[in-house]
Amino acid sequence: MTFILAATLTLNAPEFSQAHLGIGYLEWLTNSIFVAAVVSLGVLLLARGATRQMSLVPSGSQNLFEALVEGLYDMLEGIVGKHMVQKSFALLATLFIFILVSNWFALLPGVGSIGWGEKTSFFNTDVEVPLLRPSTADLNMTLAMAVFFMFMWLVWTLQEVGIKGFLEHMFGVKGGVKGLIGFLLVPIFFFVGLIEVISILFRPVSLSLRLFGNVFAGENLLTTMITIGKQLGFPEWVAALASITVPIPFYFLELLIGLLQALVFTLLCAVYLQLSTAHDEEDH
């Protein structure tokens, strides 16, 4: 197996396998962790550059970042409320921006097409282990984000309603029913509470698998479109031309899907938070 550069312009062989790039104390550094660090550093540098010389009348990159932040804030405030958005906005906005940039970073030429593999011909290369792997196409990364959010969800929920309020919300009789009827409904609502506990435990799994599955499926879709000429048995020069032109419409589709998946992940997190922290007497 040799280190090779794929001739195609994009992803060529998405893999579950990880490439460990570090040695010694950096042995834990994988291709997806490296990409996550690059994306995080890039976002920080862009944000720093946009806010270095801020003015009352924004322009250029400052205007773009302010529009993004204000739009996210207004959207999340409409879901979690004025009080909770002050606590949760930093995390939810960070998740949205990181997932969005990571999804779009995966579409850059060289991500997934440079790595270790075997060269089959001048135009076709089988990359078995890519040097750069999209972080959101790594289940470890998506699961880590989901688990960390659920931890903060539990912290914020207990801060808002307390342990007693949390248990009442999970297992208590709903609708203000009291007396004999309320007593008879206790076993039913306790069973419903157990089902709710199970659903909460599966939330990080569903969040992580949904994001991972869509991003990974997008990689495979682009791979199929790139290699379709070869798979159909076209001449090598036709297959090479098809590998460049056929995937173009799907690039725009993946740009849209990358945005939608970032929105879905963030909005689901906001909805989970709103459901557990909303007070009936408050206006949300």
Model-predicted regions and their roles:
Residues 1-284:
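Selective transmembrane helix interface/packing segments
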